[in-house]
């Protein structure tokens, strides 16, 4: 079989796989037409590789998209609603690790693009950390930092250093043990282990069975216990 025949065979196989993989209930020719009508991004107009900036620098996102219908833009940074303009400027105001999300949508659906921006230099060693339990039913716990030298407070430190990731619900305590910081929350992301200087997350355990987590107590280099409702 020559290359031309092989290409036709592969194209037929791919088309067949797409049609076969669609269920009768949620995927038909109309669905394929909708996919073809979604906003299309022009190659090279949205970064594909992670970006590193220094404090004080900025980066301008200026994607070029096309669609037979009107296109709507929605920008998020670490989960926060930032802009609905076609372009977006990321300002590296302080050290952080951020996830920028662009949603391109029209009446047929939505296309989502993600990009990570690193601004190195996080240092939370010259002050104290404040564990906020959060507003139950509305949001997760968080970490704030009081800077002794600047006499200022920075909020949402953990979230801003971990690409928008959040602690669990109703955060209770933070324990410094063997050079790591262990933060306990009652629900969801119940134990998060991080570097105490940068607050970069290194590990997490998600949900601990059906128990609430209150405090971590280190025993040795290999083991520790977590209190829950008066028990270990």
Residue ranges and their predicted role:
Residues 72-92:
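Surface-exposed, flexible coil segments in extracellular/virion-facing regions
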Residues 157-167, 204-209:
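Surface loop/turn motifs at the tips and blade-to-blade linkers of beta-strand repeat domains
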Residues 148-150, 195-199:
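Short loop/turn segments that connect beta-strands within beta-propeller blades
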Residues 166-173, 210-221:
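Repeated scaffold domains used in trafficking and secretory/extracellular systems
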Residues 52-65:
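A short beta-strand segment in extracellular, disulfide-stabilized domains
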Residues 128-138, 176, 183-187, 218, ...:
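Conserved beta-strand positions in repeat-built beta-propeller and related beta-rich domains
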Residues 2-9, 13-51, 108-128:
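Bacterial Sec-dependent N-terminal signal peptides
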């Amino acid at each position: 079989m020559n290359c031309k025949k092989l290409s036709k065979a592969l194209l037929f196989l791919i088309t067949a796989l797409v049609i076969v993989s669609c269920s009768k209930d949620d995927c038909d020719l109309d669905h394929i037409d909708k996919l073809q009508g979604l906003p299309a991004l022009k190659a090279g107009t949205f970064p594909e590789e992670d970006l590193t900036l220094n404090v004080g620098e900025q980066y301008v996102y200026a994607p070029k998209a096309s669609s037979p219908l009107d296109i709507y833009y929605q920008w998020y940074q670490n989960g926060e609603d930032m802009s609905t303009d076609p372009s977006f400027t990321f300002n590296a105001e302080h050290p952080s690790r951020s996830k920028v999300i662009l949603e391109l949508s029209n009446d047929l659906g939505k296309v989502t693009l993600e990009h990570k921006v690193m601004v190195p230099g996080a240092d939370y060693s010259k002050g104290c950390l404040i564990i906020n339990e959060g507003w139950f039913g509305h949001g997760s716990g968080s970490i704030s930092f009081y800077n002794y030298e600047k006499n200022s407070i920075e909020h949402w430190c953990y979230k801003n250093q971990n690409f928008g990731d959040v602690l669990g619900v109703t955060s209770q305590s933070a324990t410094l043990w063997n050079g790591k910081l262990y933060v306990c929350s009652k629900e969801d992301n119940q134990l998060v282990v991080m570097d105490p200087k940068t607050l970069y997350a290194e590990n997490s355990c998600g949900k601990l069975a059906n128990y609430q987590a209150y405090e971590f107590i280190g025993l040795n280099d290999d083991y520790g216990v977590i209190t829950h409702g008066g028990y270990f």
